[in-house]
């Protein structure tokens, strides 16, 4: 049986991960992944430096290795009023995948972040916590995926996310939210 393993939510040392982008890609390639996205945390303070570094690293990896490495970013703990602007800026800087740090129950994420995210130009609402049906419906209409998270803590609400997606027609994606080799 042929299977394809991808992960579109992973972190390098460009934010709070511990591996370089190259080592992250190499380890994933050795484990049989066919594609990964490097989606380091950004806000208005670092988006202009982090995204171009991810793009450069992914371009070099893709020239030499079989694993497809996709440059991305994760908008994290920002004022909800600038989520849309940051999504546009990250894409303009060359990122191919935009994810938003959703309202996980294990961090003090600003209420309304999920809603602002599904109104913005993002691809995945990661660890969306106790997402409501209205936001899940908007995600479904805009082809924004809701994440089922493999990360400790964020995974507490996976059942709710799955049921809400099933009820509203939103698409799901499983990601690890990896920050280290043990993730």
How would you describe each model-predicted region?
Residues 47-147:
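Extended substrate/RNA-proximal surfaces in nucleic-acid metabolism proteins
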Residues 108-110, 134-136, 155-160, 183:
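Short, charged, surface-exposed secondary-structure boundary motifs
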Residues 11, 42, 74-76, 103, ...:
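Catalytic metal-binding/acid-base residues of hydrolase active sites
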Residues 41, 170-183:
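Short acidic/histidine-rich active-site segments
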Residues 36-38, 126, 147-148, 172-176:
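Short hydrophobic alpha-helical runs that function as membrane-insertion/retention elements
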Residues 5-15, 38-41, 128:
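Histidine-centered catalytic micro-motifs
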Residues 1-5, 14-34, 46-49, 55-65, ...:
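Metal-centered catalytic cores of metalloenzymes
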Residues 4-6, 37, 71, 174:
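Residue-level marker for buried hydrophobic side chains located in beta-strands
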